């Protein structure tokens, strides 16, 4: 516990909350253009993860994960990006929203459809 003299000398610093998705600039989602697709995960795991390098409208160049099985994203695809990290891919702090703009929904998906941009089957 500091003394009154110490508190006069230097005041208490407020806790600053740092954003986990700075490239979105406080917006829920951002639009961007893909510049390249796929990378590999960190140590105990190995595979080609579906990841796209995206240049956002905010000017940031980020790495975003493409969720779901199969995708049609390629270079120059316009995509919508939301926050949310991927645990085994360092530096991947964003997800691409499926079913909007150029990113199509997951084919033949029955459950959890809203997360993968799939309409209700007839």
Curated annotation (Swiss-Prot):
Query: Source organism's superkingdom?
Result: Eukaryota
Q: Which GO terms describe its biological process?
A: translation
Protein's cellular compartments: Plastid, Chloroplast
Pfam families from the UniProt entry: Ribosom_S12_S23 (PF00164)
Any coiled-coil regions, as ranges: none
User: What does the subunit section of this Swiss-Prot or TrEMBL entry state?
Assistant: Part of the 30S ribosomal subunit.
Question: What is this protein's name?
Answer: Small ribosomal subunit protein uS12c
Source species, please? Illicium oligandrum (Star anise)
Organism taxonomic ancestry: Eukaryota, Viridiplantae, Streptophyta, Embryophyta, Tracheophyta
């Amino acid at each position: 516990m500091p003394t009154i003299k110490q508190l006069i000398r230097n005041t208490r610093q407020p806790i600053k909350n740092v954003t986990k998705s700075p490239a979105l600039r406080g917006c829920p989602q951002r639009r961007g253009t893909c510049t390249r697709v796929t990378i590999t995960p960190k140590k105990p795991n190995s595979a080609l993860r579906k990841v796209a390098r995206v240049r956002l409208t905010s000017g940031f160049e980020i790495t975003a994960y493409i969720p779901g099985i199969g995708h049609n994203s390629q270079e120059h695809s316009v995509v919508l990006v939301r926050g949310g990290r991927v645990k085994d891919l360092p530096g991947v702090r964003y997800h691409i929203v499926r079913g909007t703009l150029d990113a199509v929904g997951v084919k033949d998906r029955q459950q959890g459809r809203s997360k993968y941009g799939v309409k209700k089957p007839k």
